[in-house]
Amino acid sequence: MRGLWVTAVALVFVVASALAQRDGGSQTQPVPLTFGETFTLQSEILSEVRRINVYAPPPYAQSPDTRLPVLYMPDGGMAEDFLHIAGLIQVSVGNGTMRPFLLVGIENTERRRDLTGPTQSADDKKIAPRVGGSAAFRRFIRSELMPIVNTRYRTTPETAIMGESLAGLFVVETLFVEPDLFDTYIAFDPSLWWNNKELLEKAGSRSGASGKQQRTLYLASSDEKDLSLLTQQLADRLRKNAPADLRLHYEPMPQETHATIYHPAALQALRRLFKPGR
């Protein structure tokens, strides 16, 4: 791919606390703690530079023969959801409640452009200067990002994608329009109101067999009334109309708000879907 340039640097997210010495309490110079790495790539499809953040849990470094499945996440910037999801993976792998995964966070440039499909709704078009770019974003993931990740890191063919709100909408849309792209789809409070509830209305007809042996969709919803109702309706329609090769989980979480659901829902999803030995 022309125009590719990659710069790998350590992700520095906290400065180590100074340590008191025994001889009078003097302090050492602080040193950075590193957590994963970051690189950028020039996307020809999106005509812009994109930053990618990557976390590999300890088993990856312990053996040069270790290969890991990959969990992709939109909203994957350092100031977005990357760090807290990476922390969940670190803890869950460490305490043996999930299999190790390589986490690949895609940092946003124009979130509402990338994560939404075309819309006929005038209200939808008011949320950002540009919307409806999900097909191009999907091509970027498939044709530019995935090949680079598979070249730079030791990966297995297994893939998953996780997102919340508009990113959850993108996850569900991708399952419907390109189900072979990932093995596991995880969506929290997906914005199914987009384009007059198009994905919900077409849930039965657009969830045909993918050709893979099995796919998984994990849904969770908060106490947000409209979002939880739409997510429940999607789960109900898929249970009725989805093919046999789609494994569906739906977890209502009324104790959470739209602002708080991501972290606890991700913890439950990772533990349930990626148990060791599964």
Per-segment meaning from a language model:
Residues 7-16:
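Bacterial N-terminal signal peptides
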Residues 1-4:
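Positively charged n-region of N-terminal signal peptides that target proteins for export
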Residues 21-278:
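Non-catalytic cap/lid and distal C-terminal segments of serine-dependent acyl enzymes
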